Every structure is written in C-alpha cells, then in structure tokens.
Amino acid sequence: MKRRRGFVMGLIVMLAVWPAGLMAQQRYRVAACDWMMLKRQKIGEFKLAREIGADGVEMDMGPLGQRVLFDNKLRDVSFQQLFRQTADSVGVKVPSMAMSGFFAQNFLKRDNYRDLIDDCLQSMDVMGARVAFLPLGGSGHEWKEKGAARTELVHRLHEVGEMARLAGKVIAIRTQLDAKGDKKLLKEIKSDGIKIYYNLQDAVDNGRDPAKELKKLGRKRVAQIHASLTDSVTLDEDPRIDMYRVKKTLDDMNWSGWLVIERSRNAKDVRNVKGNYSRNVAYLKKIFQENK
C-alpha cells in the first residue's frame, strides 16, 4: 500500500493532459518496442519514437534476471515525473508496458509473481498504459499440455488477470499457440483481465495464416498486436506476409488498437535503429492509417 501511495503522489504532481486532438479518430495506431530500439527505460526513447514517426512506444519494465523485482526506474517519483512529462512534451503515448524479462525467466517458478505484476500495473498507472505484455517464452512447453504445470499457469494467470481487471487494465500474453490453443487457454483462465498479445512473427514462423488466425480468435480476445516478423528485411520488402490482407481482416472484425513493431529489421543492418524502424512505421501507417 505504501508503494502504491507513492506512485499516486507522483502522479498527482506530474499528470498532464495529452495534446488535444492528437491522433484523434485513428482506428489503428503504431508504436515500437523501446528495448528493441536499444532504449529500454531511457529518456531518449520518446524523442526517438517521434523521430521515426511512431504514435507511441511500448516501454519495458527493465531487466529481471535473478533480481527480486524488475530493474524499474518508474518506482522512483523523480523518474515518474521525468518520463511522463517528456512523453507528453513530444506527443508520444505509452500504450503498453512489457515484461520482457519473462522471455528468459520462468513465470511458473517465480514465487513473487504477484509482486512483479503489481510493479508493472503501478508503472502503467504512471505512464497511462492500459496493456501489460507478458511473454511466456521462458516458461517452457510443459504447460501447453494437460498436467500440473498447466494447472498452475492457469491459476496464476487467473489471479493476476483479476488484479489487472480490478485496476482497469489487461495483461496480454504471448503463447506461441495457434488460435484454437489460445481460445482454449483463455477459457480455462476465466478472467477478462487476460487476453492475447497476437504476434505476427509466431504465426508466420509456424506456417499459420495470420488473417485466418485473427479471425478465429475474434476481436474481444486480442488486446494488442506485435506487427512485425523475424529479422530478415523490413516489412515493406517482406514477401512472407500480406499486410493489406491483415488490415482487411481486422477491419472486418471491427478491431481497433495498437500495432507495435518489435523486429522486422534488415538482417544486414540490424543496428540501424532509425533506418529500420522509421521504414516499418511508415509502411504500417501507409496501410493502416492512410489506406481507408
């Protein structure tokens, strides 16, 4: 409770109104991941997001490793003010906070998983984010089949899902399952606070049709979309996906929300952050914002 009061007091000091009319009426908005742009919880991420033409940035919670909590600057009131005011000043939103530490750490083996989720939810309060990204990549594969691991995962996700729901937020999980598997898992979890963070890369890498999969999942199960593929070429040159077809599917589903760029970097020039991400942002905006 003391920590939460500290967060609230920080918010009272620095909470600002987003610029009027900014991105008004946009059905689809485009963001990029700060950790993939080498700007994890760095103040320069907002200026960079503006420079590449993005509407927002998905902020990471910071490294986890063997730490008890994320190495998260947003627990510090001074950083709360600095990050929020800087984002406001350049007109960049933070639609989501990512717990990328769980790409390597096992969610099932963290006894303090509730504390980690609470840390994320409080950081979301600071930045005005609604979606928390929880990848299950570090949790192995045992949970994908019936058994003790799945039972425990379902229990934990229901619990943290209810934490998110009561806070007016959503935890979006990346599972690498197909649409049928995702629907089954969500049905078992039984919490409106848990949805799917759909990843185009997972679908393409596993030979699945993203358009068909999205349609099977349905609008209400998809919280947000990582709209990029495995590093090879930028999206505008990648023959592995028909992004116009993806848009038509989302239009037909009446889905709206954030498309977040994680990868799709030129494999021969992966560290050219501005070049890769500005090109991908421009391509997604051309299709999803200009192509009415």
Where are the predicted features?
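Active-site-proximal loop/turn and secondary-structure-junction residues that shape catalytic pockets
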Residues: 36, 61-63, 100-103, 136-140, ...
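Bacterial N-terminal signal peptides
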Residues: 9-19
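Histidine-acidic metal/acid-base catalytic patches
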Residues: 2-3, 25-30, 38-55, 179-292
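Sec/Tat signal peptide C-region and signal peptidase I cleavage site
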Residues: 20-24
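Active-site acidic/histidine proton-transfer and metal-coordination neighborhood
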Residues: 19, 46, 50, 86-90, ...
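Charged helix-capping and loop-helix junction motifs
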Residues: 73-80, 111-118, 146-157, 209-215, ...
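Conserved beta-strand positions in the central sheet of alpha/beta enzyme cores
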Residues: 58, 96-98, 133, 172, ...
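Glycine-rich, proline-tolerant flexible connector loops at the mouths of alpha/beta enzymes
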Residues: 60-84, 136-144
